[in-house]
Amino acid sequence: MAKRPVQKIDFSPYGAAIKTARTGQKESRNKVGNEMYLSPRYLANIENNGQHPSLQIFFELMLRYNISVDQFL
């Protein structure tokens, strides 16, 4: 059976929105990382390199910064 093609999602716009919201609230990556149990480098990769976070981390970041996923659809 042939595999169904999987659509790759470009996460860059989400990462940029997270970075804008985080810096707008004057929060450092270290602060956010400590509070969310993430490394600052991982957060930087999400913000700058479009790394796909786990669904749980994605959900927590969207809630933390009140970002609507609908704006990217």
Give the label of every model feature segment.
Residues Y37-H52:
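Recognition helix of helix-turn-helix/homeodomain-like DNA-binding domains
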Residues N30, R41, D70:
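Key DNA-contact positions within bacterial/archaeal DNA-binding proteins
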Residues A2-G24:
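A short, Lys/Arg-rich alpha-helix, primarily the initiator
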Residues A16-E35, E60:
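Short basic helix-loop element that most often maps to the first helix and adjoining turn
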Residues Q56-Q71:
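DNA major-groove recognition helix of helix-turn-helix/homeodomain DNA-binding modules
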